[in-house]
Swiss-Prot record:
UniProtKB keywords: Chaperone, Cytoplasm, Disulfide bond, Redox-active center, Zinc
Cystine crosslinks: 237-239, 270-273
Subcellular location: Cytoplasm
PANTHER family, sorted: 33 KDA CHAPERONIN (PTHR30111:SF1)
GO biological process: protein refolding
Gene3D superfamilies per record: Hsp33 domain, HSP33 redox switch-like
Protein name listed in UniProt: 33 kDa chaperonin
PTMs per UniProt: Under oxidizing conditions two disulfide bonds are formed involving the reactive cysteines. Under reducing conditions zinc is bound to the reactive cysteines and the protein is inactive.
GO MF term set: protein folding chaperone; unfolded protein binding
Gene coding for it: hslO
Annotated GO CC locations: cytoplasm
Length: 298
């Protein structure tokens, strides 16, 4: 099943809902960063959460999620946009802890239960919008939920799941976000809360072949779900050799001379996707000459 996200309105517009299948997206991140199980689940959940938040944006608007906990996985940085594209990395990809008391991947142990959870939105205006909350769980889903309630002041239920196989491959990944709008009936909220308590984990549902639409039907009742949009999602990085060349020019003439004289070349690695870009000595000389021209123009 190809990865996609659905947006829905429910209960006469009093509930907004989103659900996503992201197995291929998280698999691509796992492959690119060679992550081990705990790191895969932590990075994967953050990618899925960022895609869900990104679905509330317009096409070119984008956001960054930073999870900076006190666990061995280190910081997780993920970008997403309104077109269903995401990219991200985890500082320590090689964390594989024992299963927790419930027999699940120990994401909290990898992330830590103290630290800062940050979302930065770039809506194409002069300034970005930033919100920050403490990490309350380290399980990622609960941290997204807390952020939405406190910083965005939108009561939400967010479920994120990543199922990792014994060979480190991703068996299933996905998530949902249910948002309560002003004026929602208490009986509706009670019904949804009961459903949330009864439904198996999202990753299990997706592994069993359920679609994002079916997940929402389970959570909200099929008769109440009006699907508005279906959008493909993917891991996609916008890095390029040209962009890194611009960054190399910016490091300065002395640094470029050192790369030319001592290393006779350079390699740039994108943190987000691990793509590598090689620059020959001749290319570096061209970049240095451009840096010199830029200096003279100033």
């Amino acid at each position: 099943m190809e990865d996609y996200l659905v947006k829905a309105l429910c209960y006469k517009g009093s509930i907004r809902a989103y659900a996503i299948s992201a197995t291929e997206t998280v698999s691509e991140a796992q492959r690119r960063h060679d992550t081990w199980s705990s790191s895969t689940a932590a990075l994967g959940r953050t990618l899925i959460g960022a895609l869900l938040l990104g679905a509330t944006l317009k096409g070119d608007d984008k956001l960054t999620v930073k999870v900076q906990g006190n666990g061995p996985a280190g910081a997780i940085i993920v970008d997403s946009n309104g077109r269903g594209e995401t990219k991200g990395y985890i500082k320590n990809p090689h964390v594989s802890l024992k299963l927790n008391a419930t027999g699940k991947i120990d994401v909290r142990g990898a992330v830590g239960n103290e630290g800062i959870f940050t979302v930065i939105k770039d809506l194409g205006l002069k300034e970005t919008f930033s919100g920050q909350t403490p990490i309350v769980s380290g399980e990622i889903g609960e941290d997204f939920t807390y952020f939405m309630a406190v910083s965005e002041q939108v009561p939400s239920a967010i479920g994120l799941g990543v199922l990792v196989d014994t060979d480190e491959s991703v068996k299933a990944a996905g998530g949902f976000m249910i948002q309560v709008m002003p004026g929602a009936d208490e009986s509706t909220i009670d019904f949804i809360e009961q459903r949330l308590a009864e439904v198996p984990p999202i990753s299990q549902l997706l592994e069993n072949g359920e679609t994002p639409e079916q997940v929402l039907y389970r959570l909200l009742g099929e008769d109440e779900v009006e699907i508005l949009e279906k959008m493909p999602v993917q891991f996609k990085c916008d890095c390029s050799k040209e962009k890194f060349a611009t960054a190399l020019i910016a490091v300065g003439i002395d640094e470029l001379n050192a790369m030319i004289d001592e290393d006779h070349g350079a390699e740039a690695v994108c943190q987000f996707c691990n793509n590598k870009y090689h620059y020959s000595e001749e290319e570096l000389i061209e970049l240095r000459d451009e840096a010199i021209r830029n200096t003279k123009q100033k």
